Amino acid sequence: MGQKVNPNGIRLGYIRDWRSTWYADSSSYATKLNEDIKVREFLHKKLAAAAVSKIQIERPAQNAKITIHTARPGIVIGKKGEDVEKLRAEVHKLMGIPVQINIEEVRKPEIDAKLVAESVAQQLEKRVMFRRAMKKAMQAAMKSGAKGIKIMVSGRLGGAEIARSEWARDGRVPLQTFRADVDYATAEALTTYGVIGVKVWIYKGEILPGQIAEKKNNKKGAK
């Protein structure tokens, strides 16, 4: 019987990059990994209103470079960059090393799996019918250029006594093609009936070997 694997994890090293990029020996690896987890939790909590998609952490020498991908960069930066400076000071306290924070804008939040999952979860918390929330998200994604989208919600849907899962799909979502650019994310809706889990898969097209090499070269050039 086939088993489903995390679409992001299986594509690491092919068309996906790691979200933490650093090297550590066995004595300090666990400490640094724990630091990364705490920093991500802190930033997601602190920037809950800023629609944060992902946080990338690099550690060149004895420094940390954090890139925050957000759909609302204005909220993160604040007036004249005040908020981002406060944020940098707080993260510096957490990590104990000099920190540089970069902000990258998510141009199309409608085809970002994390932002779509959180949007559906927020609607479920506001008692919007799950089918309506799913349909709205799928229509917006397809209009914004997605090749396919699948959304699954699980829990006590509509306050039902027995928990169940329901899903909907528009277009195609090829999970077994490694070069298929499939963005996957999850979110949780905390409703009065309990927790409802939301999973989102968004297919954006294929990334060919030449494009992967070009992407890596551009990244090296930017550094």
From Swiss-Prot:
* Matching Pfam families: KH_2, Ribosomal_S3_C
**Top-rank taxon, per record:** Bacteria
GO cellular-component terms in the record?
cytosolic small ribosomal subunit
A Gene Ontology biological process annotation?
A: translation
Q: Which UniProt keywords apply?
A: Ribonucleoprotein, Ribosomal protein, RNA-binding, rRNA-binding
What InterPro entries does this protein's entry cite? KH_dom, KH_dom-like_a/b, KH_dom_type_2, KH_sf_prok-type, Ribosomal_S3_C_sf, Ribosomal_uS3_bac-typ, Ribosomal_uS3_C, Ribosomal_uS3_CS
KH type-2 domain ranges (all copies): 39-107
One Gene Ontology term of the molecular function aspect:
rRNA binding
Please state which protein family the record places this protein in: Belongs to the universal ribosomal protein uS3 family.
**Subunit structure and binding partners:** Part of the 30S ribosomal subunit. Forms a tight complex with proteins S10 and S14.
Q: Which PANTHER family match?
A: 30S/40S RIBOSOMAL PROTEIN S3, SMALL RIBOSOMAL SUBUNIT PROTEIN US3C
The record describes the protein's role as: Binds the lower part of the 30S subunit head. Binds mRNA in the 70S ribosome, positioning it for translation.
Q: Which HAMAP family match?
A: Ribosomal_uS3_B (MF_01309_B)
Q: State the protein's name.
A: Small ribosomal subunit protein uS3
Q: Which organism is it from?
A: Francisella tularensis subsp. novicida (strain U112)
